[in-house]
Amino acid sequence: MIVRSLLLAGSLLLASVVPASFTLAKSDGPQIKVKEFDKVPTDVHYFEDTDTIILSGKKAELYISTDAAASWNLLEGKSGILYPNKYHTQSAVIYGPNRKHWVTFDAAKTWREFEVPDKLVYGGGFMPFTFHGKDAEKVLISAEECQFMTCRHVTYYTTDGFKTVKRLFEGDMGCFWAVGNPAFGEGEPHLPDKLDDRVFCIWPHATPLDLTRRLVYSDTYFSDRKAVAVEAGGRDIKGVNNMASVKKFLILAASSVGTSEAAIYVSKDAVHWDRADFYGGPKVRGGKFTVLESTNYSIQVNVASRRSRVPIGSLFTSDSTGTSFTMNLDGVNEDKDMITDFEQVSGIQGIFLVNIVENAEEVKKGATREKKLVSRISFDDGRTFKPLKCGDKELHLHSITRPSNIGRTYSSPAPGLVMGIGNTGDKLGTYETGDTFVSNDAGVTWRKALDKAHKYEFGDQGSLLVAVFDEYKDKIFTDEISYSLNHGKDWKKAKLPHRVTALQLTTTPDSTSLQFLLVAEDEKKKFYVMSIDFSDIHERKCEKKDFERWPARLDEKGEPDCLMGHKQFYRRRKADADCFVKEKFKEPLPETEPCQCTKEDFECAAGFLRNKDYECEPHRKVSPPEGKCKNPDDKFMGPSGYRLIPGDDCLKKGGVDLEKEVERTCKDATKAPVSGQISVEKTPFKTKNLNYRYLERSDTSSGDDETVILKTDDGDLFVTRDHGKTWQRGKFKEPISLYIPHKYDNDVIYLLTEGKKAYWSIDRAHTFHSFEGKLPITRTLGTLPLYFHPDHPDWLIWIGGQDCKGKKCTDLAYYSKNRGDEWDLLLRGVGKCMFVGKEGELTADDLIFCSQHEHEDPSKSLRLISSDDMFTKKTSVHFDGKPIVGYAKMSEFIVVATKNGTELSSFTSVDGKTFAHAAFPPNYHIDAEYAYTVLDSSTHSIFLHVTDHPAKMHEFGSILKSNSNGTSYVLSLPNANRNDRDYVDFEKIQVVEGVALANIVINPDEVKAKGQEKKFRSLITHNDGSEWALLSPPKKDVEGKNFDCKVKDKGTDDCALHLHGFTERRENRDSMSSGSAVGLIIGVGNVGSSLTPRAESDTYMSRDAGITWHQIKKGRYQWEFGDQGSIVVVVAEEKPTKVLSYSLDEGETWTDFEFSDKEVTVEDISTVPSDTSRNFILWCRPGSSNEIVAYNVDFSGLKEREKQCVLKKESPEADDYYLWSPKHPMQKDNCLFGHVSMYHRKRPEAKCYNGPKLDRLSGEKKNCQCTRQDYECDYNYERQSDGSCALVKGLKPADPMQICKDDPEAIEYFEPTGYRKLPVSTCEGGHQLDHLVARPCPNKKKEFDEKHPGIGGFGLFFAIFFPVAIATGVGYWAFSKWDGKFGRIRLGESQPESIFSRDSPLISVPVTIVAGTVAVITALPLLFSSLWRSFRGYTRLPGSWWGQRQRPYASRGAFAARRGEYVGVVDDEDELLGAEEFEGDEEEDV
């Protein structure tokens, strides 16, 4: 039941007693008793099967009536909000103030007080109490734990009715009972032993390095601190958003980066979870679906249309497993909150009413926003829908989206009685012009009951109908009620004691009472609660002769109809009987008669779907039994495709049995077992240029297609869904000029023509729809014509060109919020416009940034402006309108380059409002004609390449790295190579944190002074650019021969491995590493003192993320990783060949395969971007330069890849996988960025395939102590040859007190040391090189002292006299043993050996005997402070629970930034991890 109320929140005062009752003569009507209140009563709640009612009043006061509203009393000593337990109707909890609450288990007769340690939470998606479906004493409690202005979510629980309250989970996003509904588990044969104790919680970080939300569970209330993640298909379900309990089903919704499609998982036993498939209608996208009122054998879901600005949905019904949904009805009406016009008739199986938008297609296309609503009813569980009939006219009724009362909209437990407000005609009119209609045969026929709209209720099992005039909106008052004693045929009226407008009319939940409650308001703003009692109208109690055996469902012939194997009957009072049933609290129960089985009693079995004729057809080819189908013409006995619906009790004897096996032909069955061979399919295309794109799949993408599109030179578009085996040519009226994949939704692609016409597909190029822009796309060089919103996939910005001259136009920006159906002007004279708002970041959701030419003149300079209302009223001009060169959005950063005379400056913002000037390294002047290239920001620092030498073909520059908020840059790598297109030889190694490769120019002076050709060396970093080193060369080449230089354990200036980088790559999408083949890197290059020309290169591979290398092929080869690295394919580069080589053991051995009978030149080799497929495409050029031939090469037939690998989380190294840890080559342990990471890798010798993308990250063994590799040089410091950081001569450290100015809440700052911690590092303890000496911020001395408290007399003795006693010896010993230099801190080795090691933080200042004393004394409070920080670390939530009602964790990114871990990290440094959030930002030129 959906509970609604139009009542305004307010306070309530019991007024002085008015006359006790207003009584009519017994024969004239009901007895009415009135209580007056000066504020509107709210939240009326009946305890079921009692006359006890509680309502809310003034300042959360609660009032109680135990005589069906005849009298009221204050609930003494208790106040707050009442939360009824809907599964245990005698139970309710009062959420009280001051952490005191109350619970009752006997309908408010007695109450038990209890306390919860923290403040309870409601709103923002959280409810304070989650009740168990079967045990009233088991309750989950939602709270928030706050300290130091920061809060996090905490869940408590009780199993003994609040006698004890214990903590369950911290930092969760909500917890749920497995048995969240009384029906859950019924009929299931295999249930967990402790199902009643099983609790699920949404957990944001299953491991500290993987911040995607999981659903975890425990049968011991997490008392052992162990959480088991829910799986589907052997993989953790990630990106969990919410969970719900619906009858016998648990439903889980999940999302992932790269698609707007949501995944729905269903379980009937709280153990096994299966993904639900939706057929025949739109996919479930985002959170846009509503689980409707469902049955024990089926789930009803309304899926919102993605296209329409006006809310419209599609109704889906599941099979009995809850995993196969079929669309029953399109165009279902819903409101902006996704409340859906759908309601089942109470107590009768298979009948429900729904309102649909008859002009849905016009509304979706934007032709109109006015919905034409019509009502429909189904009598067969949604198979068919019919109009409602009032005589010979169609009837349309207002539904849930227009509530007028509380409780159900149309019906009640009164058998067959249905009422509604509406009108006859061709569409639904307004509520105010509607009349009141009634049906006494469950909606088959209708009659007009009363003129005008009324609130209505049912009593005495339907023998009494009560209605009151309902015009609250227009404040029209009435002094009478209407009632009917014969199912609405005739109506009588009764006078009310006051002229009022009705606010609420209700009665007992089971509609068996003769007493009703009316909440009303009069013209003087007085409020009344009226008890209306009809008990004395009929003196006679009904006898057997007064009842009929009423069939609940009728077929087309008017005969009792069958559903779920039986007919349904009710014992119901005859309409004209002059008696009352008077069986209070005895709800009518149905009688059933069994039916013989018919086709309707069966549903499609797994792997089968209904067709348009309601027949079950195979969704995929049927697998034959083993040993069958040796020949295509053979036949076998296979599944029929049907199964009896579980719970259906039809009689098979004498009826239909569709479950029997049927004969099937082998040619329609699945393919034969694997052949052991690699298969090849060849397709030629007439085109000179190769232009293709994969539509990548994400974690929650449905289906299994591998879709590729190819555009030819003449504008044709070809699509393959099987990775190049078969292709289809698109049918478009105009040639396609370019395609633009949606940046944030891989399922969506846009095709643009030279004019205004464009096409879009949201189903992975299966179907295309067209629209027109306001102007043809821009021709301005370097300007993209289409921009997308990261969270609203249908929001577009279109850049159209006007007055184009060559490749220069006056560009206008338009926006659409419905995928191009409607366009509105944003700005004229723009450079580019883009959405920069993103959920989980500090920017506003609808924030747009535009660069606009002065005076809208394209010859003028650009300025940066922004707006969060589409530039209708509010426009912010940044940098006082001064010229900018460009701007870019990278992860959470907005980076802007401004031009000030001859100097180029950079600014950074994380909220789109405040820009901080980027402080570049000292003495670093950037001329205005130089270029920035933003390289990467995936580790929450910006890598920026700044050109130092722009001479054509001689470009190079410096790679700078920012702090975590992008405002302070230090030099990471000088002389980094760049080309004339602003691409840089810099590449991050995927998955493994902080590893990157770069090429530097080793003769910069000669290049600058003499114009010499650039010479290169390759460098690698393992700590995110803090340190760079030469690549270690292999010991021998692939033939076992020595190299020309002397190879050592590490790369040297004379002998190292050098690899050709990004600037020489023919296809920018190719990469040296893979996002799924962890640790594998391939490149072409040479061993020597510098990089030789590409033509002289060989091919090399690393299996340990770049620490060691080996040569795999002589000569240059192209490569691709498949099946997450279990297949590696290489093919000769830029020379004719007909052979490829592949490795199944990470490059240890190679096998040649002839893919063509003639030699061709391979232009490119490709596979899906996630590298999870066993299919590849070789894009080849035969003799003709105007033809491309695509060779699909399929490795899935190999015997070595026949079975799927086995990975068990409880024993990850027991079967086909092992655990691998990346490490730093200069460290003895496997610590990288302050932690040990463990990754699942397939054993090279295992003969199996990986299949769906693995959760590669196994977990984190531990956080490590901080070492030199966890720090980099601070601003105005530079690295010395010995690895230390020293202040640049003539400069001062950055102002350490700036943090106090920037953050009014800051209590302290730290004196500069020359070092800053890498933002991505999670190390603890060890060398705290950036936080040595703390000082109080101005006016924060008191708070500082409280944070760093002093010590008492006894402690003071040891803190002063004992250190002084040993200071001389310690200081002298340290001085004599230490060989460091004054004025700098030397970074230590991997682990501190002792407190007096040469790298100890204690020895970090000029040392004298006295300094030894000072250091020891100072260390004590600092050590305490450090320990305290490691135990607090609360995270800041956005806004107030009580104010905004905002859910604190709206997205993965938001939760990544609020992990709830007790780690002392500055807020700006908190969002460090979460590879799932990385959107694959490519280099972006500013």
UniProtKB/Swiss-Prot annotation:
Spans of BNR repeats, please give.
377-386, 437-447, 483-493, 718-728, 1100-1110, 1142-1151
Membrane topology, Lumenal segments: 26-1349, 1423-1486
In terms of SMART domains, this protein maps to:
VPS10
Where are the membrane-spanning stretches? 1350-1370, 1402-1422
Q: Would you name any one GO CC term?
A: membrane
Which loops or segments lie on the Cytoplasmic side of the membrane, by the record? 1371-1401
Record keywords:
Glycoprotein, Golgi apparatus, Membrane, Protein transport, Receptor, Repeat, Signal, Transmembrane, Transmembrane helix, Transport
Matching entries from InterPro entries are given as: Sortilin_C (IPR031777), Sortilin_N (IPR031778), VPS10 (IPR006581), VPS10-sortilin (IPR050310), WD40/YVTN_repeat-like_dom_sf (IPR015943)
Residues in a coiled coil are none
- Pfam families recorded for this chain? Sortilin-Vps10, Sortilin_C
Query: Which residues carry a glycan?
Result: 296, 900, 965
Signal peptide positions on this chain: 1-25
Q: Where in the cell is it found?
A: Golgi apparatus, trans-Golgi network membrane; Prevacuolar compartment membrane
- What are the GO BP annotations of this UniProt entry? Golgi to endosome transport; Golgi to vacuole transport; protein targeting to vacuole
Bilayer disposition of the protein: Multi-pass membrane protein
PANTHER family this protein is in? SORTILIN RELATED, SORTILIN-RELATED RECEPTOR
The UniProt family comment states:
Belongs to the VPS10-related sortilin family.
Task performed by this protein:
Functions as a sorting receptor in the Golgi compartment required for the intracellular sorting and delivery of soluble vacuolar proteins, like carboxypeptidase Y (CPY) and proteinase A. Executes multiple rounds of sorting by cycling between the late Golgi and a prevacuolar endosome-like compartment.
Name the chain's protein: Vacuolar protein sorting/targeting protein 10
Native organism: Arthroderma benhamiae (strain ATCC MYA-4681 / CBS 112371) (Trichophyton mentagrophytes)
Lineage, opening ranks: Eukaryota, Fungi, Dikarya, Ascomycota, Pezizomycotina
| Gene that encodes it | VPS10
